[in-house]
Amino acid sequence: MRISLSTARRLAIRAQGLDGQWRLPKGKEGVAQAVERLGYVQIDTIAVVRRAHHHTLWSRRHDYQPGMLHELQAKDRRVFEYWCPAASYLPMRDYRYYLPTMRGIANSPRTRAWLADHANLVDEVVKRIRREGPLTSADFAAPEGRKRGSWWDWKPAKQVLERLFSMGELMIAERRNFQRVYDLTERVLPPDADTKQPSEDERARFLVRRALSSKGIASAEQMGWGRMGDRAAAARALEQMVESGEVTPVEITGLDAGPHYAWTETLEAVSGRTRGRKHLHILSPFDSLVIDRRRLRTLFNFDCKLECYFPEAKRRYGYFCLPILWGDRFVGRLDPKADRKQKTLLVRKAMFEPDFTDYEPLLPALAEKLRAFAAFNECERVVVERTEPRKLRVPLTRALRAAPAPSRCAGQPTR
């Protein structure tokens, strides 16, 4: 089957809940369902605007509040933290499929050797957590008057915590001021958590289902099997799902990228549907839609560079650029900073793609979204310093003045 590039993009956008078709409940339950549908939400430390995990969820539900994610992890146990492959929030219902990864880490020769070399420290760390309850790495700092170098030394203790977490012996009970709080896995897992080790075939089918459900359309390479499972088993599972008719292989017109795969049911729905209203999104660079940079270039002809690690003189787009998605294409980038003391969202630069010129309908939509994003970042106004092209700064500023005030669901604290 052959599909257009536009259809492929719409499949990807729909799977990510960015085309207005998701029907999620309001509040925390809607956030939990968003995590389940996305499969994972990547965690990141950069905080020039709301951190990536909060930003990603806000992009799907504008009534999202950061406290909702905390409750889903710390109280409701609907999500947990683990590697996917970076640190991520994951649906608790998928916990069992990560057990083989944990077991593989625990049984690796490198881990066994490290544990043998640090056996006393491991024992002391586990005993403290069992006795005192959930602890952060900072709780293992050396007490006043005690020399560093003993088991109280923070760095070795932190390494133990991270090793035991990767092995599945400890879990993150919650985050306090973004610091991980570790506890025994048996005390974090909810009573109804499924802890049965999946068979190789079960896990392979899970990997294919998660990839297609979250990506909408993907090549075998883009499914990321090598990071988590056996490539051969996943390839067999994919082949079986194609044979059963669940999955359809497609070629994308205009792309020399080999076969891609999509759910047959979704493919039929999107292929037979005319384009609806364009939705505009300001996305995190760690958003699930853009995190695979190679796929982003292939499917959307868009480059999303993270330049915060570059010297300032070598940055083309800015410290922490946010892609602008409008309809089924990426039309530009923003380099923002939330000054919460001044309650101002500063857009240091708004840049648009060289081949994009349809500014008249875009600017009002962008202005409205910027005001909502500002509210989400606890800011009351938006200031645009520069634009590329330069001629757009005045009309964008004018559009911001005319944009409707964001509702409380745009990220304002609720009481």
Kindly give the residue locations of the regions a language model identified.
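Long, charged, low-complexity, helical-prone intrinsically disordered regions
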Residues: M1-R415
